Amino acid sequence: MTKVVVVGDGLVSAETLAEAALELNIEEPVEVTKYHWYADLNKEQFQEKIKLIEQKGPESVEIPAGILDDMKEADYLLVHIAPVSKAMIEAAPRLKLVGTCRGGIEHVAVEELKKRQIPLIHVIRNAEPVADFTLGLFYALTRNIAFSY
């Protein structure tokens, strides 16, 4: 049995991550355990948690209650912005891979993963559209397109 732990949040739900986990090309049967990290906060409150992680790293916020127990048997961990703390990694002797669906990795204890030679995959989905939009704004402004002259 392959065990995947997923941690959803206010932007990417645990259900979405669980669906993605079931599509992975990994040994079956697959058991997915779902956690929610501050999914019940309003936008401003959630942004404060994100800001804290971005400024102080994954150890600066609480991890979901009970997750350390499930990490003991976890083969894979999938998150969005939820912290991947040193304690979570230390609790997971079977961990083969951590996946995060965002460009930044400030929410992950990268040094601990390196120490244990556990791969980290981070999916960057919006880098190209953001660059396109930025260049479009640049042209619109420098050529006065928005002002029609």
Protein language model regions, located:
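Phosphate/diphosphate ligand-binding glycine-rich loop within oxidoreductases
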Residues: 75-149
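N-terminal glycine-/charge-rich "phosphate-binding" loop or analogous flexible N-terminal tail
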Residues: 1-74
